[in-house]
């Protein structure tokens, strides 16, 4: 009886938090140019569209934000029986501050600050970038035909490798993730980068370069090589008819350095979305448990992403492989994921679905095979375009390849989460 009361109290608290915030986030939509709306309208938007959907009259600053609150009821265990006890309660709320500024016709600035995060309780700048869709600030009509299909992006921010990063939770911006956790191998990093995107008649092409560094520094030592990271994407995205949309992309990322290019699966400074899990009674806790980072140097990664939407049915998949060089051990990991959703209601404001995610491979050739599986089942309700509440059951298992004295040996965590979100 007490457990049921806890659940009811938690649900009431989360719902009350949402409805109190909904007054300030009623279907807000900006008229910024070439912009992905930070609302339900931004669902299933990947690269920013090449339709302006706004006119430039003067410099315009749009201040927005994200807020996410969780109730977590997860248990964990391992073969050593040396993990901390977990209860059912509210996690630390997370919040983002978003500043988007239209500087000129076709010239826009984005800046995001994590006001509160699992990994940083204090305010912490995630990154920012400038997006250029017109070059009229150089000269009216400059390269006009090219810029009708091209977007130039430069900054210190997340770069466009793969499609999964468009659907992930970015600290408190959880609106586009139908579940609570991100994928086990979470391909996301913020680095100094520049990229060019071409979109024409459904064709998508991206080519870009980063400096391969998450933490910037000009200090060098005997191991510094400062190798650049190169990445790209080719794909096709078409609304075939009113009911059917098809998208298929393939992306690659490559860095031959020893001191750079190691952050592709460890670049998120917000922290994972599951709290307290797999924390040993002795030893330091990690804010990133539940994820897996190969920590490869001289890596090459490839990610293939199918996306299909037919009426309310939606499928998104990941086929991904990352490997390092022969000198570094010739290791390799493969990630597979499939996410199936059914969106329903007059505006598809409700959804139900499931996700299966697995990572397997080895750190060095002929080494012990590691295998991790996760299942998510849940659903959500968009109370308005800017307000979402979601419920999930999840189960993650560390299946193979962990040493007898590792806390991951026989490891498992499973349970229920309620997550409430406001984004505007």
List each language-model region with its residue ranges.
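Alpha-helix capping and helix-loop boundary segments enriched in small/acidic/polar residues
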Residues: 184, 221-222, 407-408
């Amino acid at each position: 009886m007490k457990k049921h009361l806890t659940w009811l109290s938690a649900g009431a608290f989360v719902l009350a938090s949402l409805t109190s915030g909904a007054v300030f986030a009623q279907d807000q939509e900006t008229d910024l140019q070439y912009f992905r709306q930070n609302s339900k309208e931004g669902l299933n938007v990947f690269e920013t569209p090449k339709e302006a959907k706004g006119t430039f009259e003067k410099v315009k600053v749009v201040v927005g934000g994200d807020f996410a609150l969780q109730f977590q009821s997860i248990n964990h265990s391992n073969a050593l029986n040396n993990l901390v006890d977990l209860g059912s309660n509210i996690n630390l709320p997370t919040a983002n501050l978003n500043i988007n500024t239209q500087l000129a016709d076709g010239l826009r600035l984005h800046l995001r600050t994590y006001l509160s995060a699992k990994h940083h309780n204090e305010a912490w700048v995630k990154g920012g970038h400038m997006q250029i869709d017109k070059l009229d600030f150089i000269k009216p009509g400059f390269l006009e035909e090219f810029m009708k299909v091209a977007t130039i992006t430069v900054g210190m921010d997340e770069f466009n490798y793969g499609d999964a990063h468009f659907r992930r939770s970015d600290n408190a911006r959880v609106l586009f993730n139908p579940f609570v956790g991100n994928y086990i191998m979470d391909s996301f990093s913020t680095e100094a980068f520049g990229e060019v995107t071409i979109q024409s008649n459904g064709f998508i092409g991206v080519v870009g370069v980063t400096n391969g560094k998450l933490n910037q520094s000009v200090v060098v030592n005997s191991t510094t090589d400062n190798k650049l990271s190169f990445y790209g994407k080719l794909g096709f995205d078409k609304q075939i008819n009113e009911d059917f949309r098809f998208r298929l992309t393939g992306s690659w990322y490559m860095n031959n350095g020893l001191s750079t290019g190691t952050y592709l699966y460890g670049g998120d400074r917000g922290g994972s979305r599951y709290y307290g899990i797999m924390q040993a009674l002795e030893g330091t806790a990690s804010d990133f448990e539940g994820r897996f980072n190969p920590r490869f140097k001289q890596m090459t990664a490839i990610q293939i992403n199918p996306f299909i939407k037919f009426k309310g049915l939606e499928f998104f998949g990941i086929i991904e492989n990352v490997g390092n060089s022969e000198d570094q051990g010739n290791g390799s990991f493969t990630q597979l994921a499939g996410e199936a959703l059914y969106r329903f209601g007059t505006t598809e404001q409700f959804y139900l679905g499931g996700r299966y995610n697995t990572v397997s491979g080895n750190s060095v050739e002929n080494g012990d095979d590691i295998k991790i599986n996760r299942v998510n089942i849940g659903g959500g309700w968009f109370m308005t375009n800017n307000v979402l509440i979601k419920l999930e059951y999840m189960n993650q298992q560390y299946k193979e390849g962990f040493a007898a004295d590792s806390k991951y040996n026989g490891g498992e965590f499973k349970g229920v989460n309620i997550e409430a979100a406001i984004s505007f």
